[in-house]
Every structure is written in C-alpha cells, then in structure tokens.
Amino acid sequence: MMIAFSTGSLHTYGLARVAHLAAAAGFDGLELMVDDRWDTRDAAHLRAVVESAGIPIVSVHAQARPGNRGWEEDEVARLHRAVTLAHAVGARTVVAHPPLRYRWVSLRHPPFITLAMVTPFRQRSPYRRWLLAELESYQAREAITIAIESMPRHRFGPWLADLFEMNEIRDLRRFPAITLDTTHVATWGVDLLETYEVLAHCVAHVHLSNYDRRQHRLPQDGSLALGPFLAALRRRGYEGAIVVELQPDALEAGDEGRVRGRLAETVAFCRAHFIADPHRRGIDGQAAWMKDSASLT
C-alpha cells in the first residue's frame, strides 16, 4: 500500500513543483493527471521530474475529456494511450472514467480559448461496448490494472442526475477493478462504509478526499468519516494505492507555507489510520519503485 498524491490537486502548479512538494510532505508516490499540458504526457520529461524529486508515478489518470489538443477524441484510443504512457513511466495502474451518458461538445477559438460542455443529447458509445466485451482481456494482455472510477452525481433542484453510464453500484461490481472515489460516493447520498463493503472485492485503487457540499476537500476536514474508512481498508487487507485527490483551494494553493503544512497533515492523517509502521512501508515502496525504474532506462 502506498499513500500517493494526485498531480491534479495542484494543477495550477508545474509538475516539478508538485513532485517536490509531495516528496517533501512524505507521500510515497504520485498519480499523474493527464491534462491539456504537454508535460503531462511526455514520458521522458516525466521520468526526469520524478527522478529529480525522488518520488515515483504509481498511477496514471487517463485523459478524461475530449477536445484536448494532441490527445485522441475516441475514448478507447485515449485509454490505450494512457496505458502506453503508464508503461513508459513505470506506473502499474491506469484510472479511467466510465462512459458519458450524454454527448460532449468542444468549441475552440485559436489560440487559447477552448470551451467544453455536456449536451442533453444521449449517446451509446463504442467505449461502453468495449468495456463490457474487451476490458478484462486487454488488461490481462497489458499486465496493468485498469481501474474504472466511481463518478459523482449532480443535483439540479430536487433531482439527482448521473451524467455517466455504468456508474451504479450494480454496474461497478461487474468490473475487474475499480477506483473508489470517496468524495464522489458522498454525492450519491449513500453510506461510504456500506458502499465499500459491497464493492470491496473489486476496489483496486482509492481516491481519498472529504466532502462538505464541495468535492475534494482535505481528508481530515468534512462530513465523511474517512478515519474509519481507512481502518476498514486495513482490516480487509487492501494493498492498492490510496491517492489523495483534492482541489487546489483545499490546500490554499498560492501560499507555500499553508500548502506544505496541509500536505504534511494529510499524510499524517492517512498513516495514523492505516499504516502500523509508516516509515517501513514508505521506504519499502520507494525502494521497489527505484529498482523498477532502473530497468526503464
């Protein structure tokens, strides 16, 4: 088990700065959030960044939104490319979203403006069919874990809307591996611990953050009882990564001292509730990564 930090938590910072902050705070690894910045998909640059910071990339979050330049529009092709990138940087897990229920439209006005929005028009994407028919065999061939993420629901007045297909508990149970996102589960209006007990057999990856009507809050600050959740992971022998995934404002991005302090507090919270011997686990995890990374060069 590793406590990792999503680079998307400080997406307004450069990758090198994020990597060094995470390493200094005591995180064991990084989850790379692929976005519209070229640096998030350049394997050689990424290897140089993490080697300099002394922290591994343990997972890659596939590009989730169409319309980003230099990245495929097709959802299956985007996932394949994320797997290729994961192999290149030594990551063992790729996080992918389930299919969007509605069609996505991107509008560009060169050179800088890109607008993206979900339309009210339903779609039945080839990606959904691929997940049902080919995901398991593809994952086995690639020798990598592809963990489909539990996504949020959105409230419109009295209605709770799900913009994603295959995002019900009964659907997620069918995947060989999932990413359980705690703040997203909070938007469903269900009990987190009960949900985990139902899905535990397929939870291979965790996105950890709290909820206070805003998503992706600090684990130690919100309405979710994440201490008992971490203890439940430990009791069940969970061996995957626990990735802290936040919004920049939760860390008070822009204030270096506050960012460093909140990151350190978050690592301490996670270790206190999960790891009996935090120093040993962190050293063992990083040593294993350093050995694997040497084989990539």
Functional labels for PLM-detected ranges:
Residues 8-15, 32-45, 65-75, 101-106, ...:
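Acidic-and-aromatic substrate-binding clefts and catalytic sites of carbohydrate-active enzymes
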Residues 243-249:
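Short acidic/histidine-rich active-site segments
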Residues 27, 88-91, 143, 203, ...:
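A structural motif
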Residues 43-48, 72-80, 128-132, 161-166, ...:
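Charged helix-capping and loop-helix junction motifs
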Residues 29-30, 60, 124, 132-223:
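Acidic/histidine-rich catalytic cores of soluble enzymes
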Residues 1-92, 121-125, 173-177, 260, ...:
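N-terminal pre-domain/capping segments
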Residues 218-242:
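P-loop/Walker A phosphate-binding loop and immediately adjacent motor/lid segment at beta-alpha junctions
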Residues 16, 52, 69-177, 292, ...:
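Active-site acidic/histidine proton-transfer and metal-coordination neighborhood
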